[in-house]
Regions:
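Extended hydrophobic
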Residues: 128, 136-225
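A structural signal for short hydrophobic beta-strand segments in well-ordered beta-sheet cores
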Residues: 10-11, 58, 180
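Short hydrophobic alpha-helical segments used for membrane anchoring or interfacial signaling
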Residues: 58-63, 71-72
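Short regulatory alpha-helical segment in sensory/regulatory domains of signaling proteins that mediates
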Residues: 45-53, 57, 154, 217
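Conserved segment of winged-helix/HTH DNA-binding domains
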Residues: 23-51, 71, 77-81
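N-terminal helix-turn-helix
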Residues: 1-38, 218-222
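Short, solvent-exposed recognition segments
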Residues: 78-169
């Protein structure tokens, strides 16, 4: 492992947590389709971020959860648990709900079956797992919805076209996300923001994100409506 750290393929922080290193991330950025997606999306993330000046992020669904591909943040923005190349919970975040709601049915069902033991459970949030102190306002333990509740939430997201989650990971934050559709019409990614829970402008956030998502979809050659 030390050799990988020296080669910048891995990095170890002061708490001993090992993460992908800069060189590994750069190598992935040049080759992975998801990184091509992130590059296509970046101008639209910048546009959203310039309006809201909080956190704007792009994510995809993989076997283990919600993988964050890109994040833009402004100084003084509300707390946000997302890290680039890190993962977020799939059942308690706006990004996760959008990705599951707009995934192919078989993909969503397979994912739910794989993680069924997490549904209806109260789980430790990752700051505790990594041995770090939990910042004020960050929930140390997160309750996931039951399977019937999850399915109702996903139906709501499909009907409304976006997901909004208040205070699931951070008490003062609201996550809002929309799908970015690929050529097959299903979600290739999710575009989301984290904003203050009581922000007066939140009703305008879904239309803003939908406009940006359509632009990304056009860039990908996908569905733009």
């Amino acid at each position: 492992m030390d050799r990988l750290v020296r080669a910048e393929l891995l990095q170890k922080d002061e708490d001993g947590v090992v993460r992908p290193g800069l060189r590994l991330w750069e190598m992935a950025s040049r080759s992975a389709p998801s990184m091509s997606l992130a590059r296509t999306a970046m101008p639209f993330l910048v546009d959203v971020q310039s309006v809201l000046r909080q956190h704007t992020q792009l994510a995809v669904l993989d076997d283990d959860g919600v993988l964050v591909l890109a994040r833009l943040s402004s100084q003084g923005a509300v707390v946000n648990q997302a890290d680039v190349a890190g993962r977020l919970p799939p059942f308690t975040t706006a990004l996760g709900l959008v990705l599951l709601a707009h995934a192919p049915v078989e993909t969503a069902e397979r994912f739910i079956a794989r993680h069924r033991d997490r549904l209806g459970a109260v789980v430790d949030h990752h700051p505790l797992e990594s041995g770090r102190a939990v910042p004020a306002g960050v929930r140390a333990r997160v309750a996931t919805p039951s399977e019937p509740r999850l399915r109702a939430l996903l139906a709501d997201v499909r009907r409304e076209g976006y997901a909004a989650v208040d205070g699931a990971l951070d008490e003062e934050s609201r996550g809002v996300a929309v799908p970015v559709r690929g050529a097959d019409g299903v979600a290739a990614a999710a575009l989301g923001v984290v904003v203050p829970r009581e922000a007066p402008y939140t009703p305008g956030v879904p239309p803003l994100l939908m406009t940006a998502a359509r632009g990304i979809a056009r860039g990908l050659g996908g569905h733009s409506h």
